[in-house]
UniProtKB/Swiss-Prot annotation:
Protein name as catalogued: Prokaryotic ubiquitin-like protein Pup
Pathway: Protein degradation; proteasomal Pup-dependent pathway
Subunit text: Strongly interacts with the proteasome-associated ATPase ARC through a hydrophobic interface; the interacting region of Pup lies in its C-terminal half. There is one Pup binding site per ARC hexamer ring.
Keyword Cytoplasm: no
Lineage of source species: Bacteria, Bacillati, Actinomycetota, Actinomycetes, Bifidobacteriales
Residue ranges, annotated region (ARC ATPase binding): 23-61
Short name of any one Pfam family annotated for the protein: Pup
Organism the protein comes from: Bifidobacterium longum (strain DJO10A)
UniProt remark on domains: The N-terminal unstructured half of Pup provides a signal required to initiate unfolding and degradation by the proteasome but is not needed for pupylation, while the C-terminal helical half of Pup interacts with ARC to target proteins to the proteasome.
Region (Disordered): 1-36
């Protein structure tokens, strides 16, 4: 008879672990999506800068003289 009560507890623990894993995965996916959005914004900014004045952008990285 005690075995009958242990099985639902084990199932409940497994369900709680599954719920915790699902929550963690959802949070990780949300964070990844946010990071991808930030990266896209940075790349868009670089692209627009290059479209408007690529030469000035590149020259800002070129060393001059003894720099």
């Amino acid at each position: 008879m005690p075995q009958q009560f242990e099985q639902p507890q084990a199932q409940q623990a497994a369900t709680q672990e599954d719920d915790a894993l699902a929550t963690t995965q959802a949070a990780a996916q949300t964070e990844s999506a946010d990071q991808a959005d930030v990266l896209d914004d940075i790349l868009d900014d670089i692209e627009s800068t290059l479209e408007t004045n690529a030469e000035e952008y590149v020259n800002s990285f070129v060393q001059k003289g003894g720099e």
